[in-house]
From Swiss-Prot:
GO terms for biological process: bacterial-type flagellum assembly; bacterial-type flagellum-dependent cell motility. It comes from Escherichia coli (strain K12). Belongs to the FliK family. The keyword Protein transport does not apply. Controls the length of the flagellar hook. InterPro entries: Flag_hook_Flik, Flagellar_hook_control-like_C, FliK, FliK-like_C_sf. One of its GO terms (cellular component) is bacterial-type flagellum hook. This is Flagellar hook-length control protein. Keywords: Bacterial flagellum biogenesis. Residues 328-339 have a biased composition (Low complexity). Two-domain protein with the central portion of the sequence acting as a hinge or connector between the two. It comes from the Bacteria. Residues 319-363 are annotated as: Disordered.
Length: 375
């Protein structure tokens, strides 16, 4: 770095020169100014020299030291300062602090840049608002995005649909009617299949054929027969009578109108029982083809009456026979019918005798084909 030689020396005798004090002050100012221009002096270094200079007396007409210092400060402020601050390392920032003038210049540059940025931001906001207002005033312009509930499915345009295939094939195979001698080409398999399906759907199906399963009578399967209870006690014994009475009481409580009891041994057959209960009055009819079984049933009626009374049912009419009531009615009806036919037969014979028959008809019946000459 270039260093300027100090301008003030202690050996110079300034007393012999005219205006020595003024020249000393001027020389001191020039020395300070040269050091400030070289960038090597600081305010702390220049302050003692200025203080030394102020101790010297001034003559009339000489400039004051304070005026000289103010002129030096103004000259320092007039030094051009670059807008871009120099790059300062950490070591330089700690060793050489900035001067007051440089700090003020840097602050002015920073304020200027901040003002420019704020103006640019305001300008951008104003331009954006103006553009949005202009676009909103344009007809048919809508900034709001349209929200759709379901994503629209776009069919691929590369693959033709079945309808386009059919239409193109029909157009290629179609020919004008005026072309002579060109036989009609058969339809494609896809078109033929589609037409056949359409014909099947359009043709009404007969109602009778569809309704035939409903009209046919439902074949009911026979219900499984419940095995009739068996009276295993000896016929006519007290145990047999008790068992018979208990079964009949159970039938009345269950509301059954007909029941069967098998006897032991099996040769005795079964006892068919018909019940009818009305206002706690029971009517019973028991049928058995064996005479000694019917006698045992008649002997068990008192025990049966007592058993029903314990259940709150009074035995009213009882009937024990060798055939059922329906069989008796059928036999009676057949007997009456035979009697009616017997009564009508003699009447038919009398009618045949009394009917007048012509002689010609009688001759035809007897086979006599002669001619009556006396007629």
């Amino acid at each position: 770095m270039i260093r300027l030689a100090p301008l003030i020396t202690a050996d110079v005798d300034t007393t012999t020169l005219p205006g020595g004090k003024a020249s000393d002050a001027a020389q001191d100012f020039l020395a300070l100014l040269s050091e400030a221009l070289a960038g090597e002096t600081t305010t702390d270094k220049a302050a003692p020299q200025l203080l030394v200079a102020t101790d010297k007396p001034t003559t009339k007409g000489e400039p004051l030291i304070s005026d000289i210092v103010s002129d030096a400060q103004q000259a320092n402020l007039l030094i051009p300062v670059d807008e871009t601050p120099p790059v300062i390392n950490d070591e330089q920032s700690t060793s050489t602090p900035l001067t007051t003038a440089q700090t003020m210049a840097l602050a002015a540059v920073a304020d200027k840049n901040t003002t420019k940025d704020e103006k640019a931001d305001d300008l951008n906001e104003d331009v954006t608002a103006s553009l949005s207002a202009l676009f909103a005033m344009l007809p048919g312009f809508d900034n709001t995005p349209k929200v759709t509930d379901a994503p629209s499915t776009v069919l691929p345009t590369e693959k033709p649909t079945l309808f386009t295939k059919l239409t193109s094939e029909q157009l290629t195979t179609a020919q004008p009617d005026d072309a002579p001698g060109t036989p009609a080409q058969p339809l494609t398999p896809l078109v033929a299949e589609a037409q056949s399906k359409a014909e099947v759907i359009s043709t009404p199906s007969p109602v009778t054929a569809a309704a035939s399963p409903l009209i046919t009578p439902h074949q009911t399967q026979p219900l499984p027969t419940v095995a009739a209870p068996v009276l295993s006690a000896p016929l006519g014994s007290h145990e047999w009578q008790q068992s018979l009475s208990q079964h009949i009481s159970l039938f009345t409580r269950q509301g059954q109108q007909s029941a069967e009891l098998r006897l032991h041994p099996q040769d005795l057959g079964e006892v068919q029982i018909s019940l009818k209960v009305d206002d706690n009055q029971a009517q019973i009819q028991m049928v058995s083809p064996h005479q000694h079984v019917r006698a045992a049933l008649e002997a068990a009626l008192p025990v049966l009456r007592t058993q029903l009374a314990e259940s709150g049912i009074q035995l009213g009419q009882s009937n024990i026979s060798g055939e059922s009531f329906s069989g008796q009615q059928q036999a009676a009806s057949q007997q009456q019918q035979s009697q009616r036919t017997a009564n009508h037969e003699p009447l038919a014979g009398e009618d045949d005798d009394t009917l007048p028959v012509p002689v010609s008809l009688q001759g035809r019946v007897t086979g006599n084909s002669g001619v009556d000459i006396f007629a």
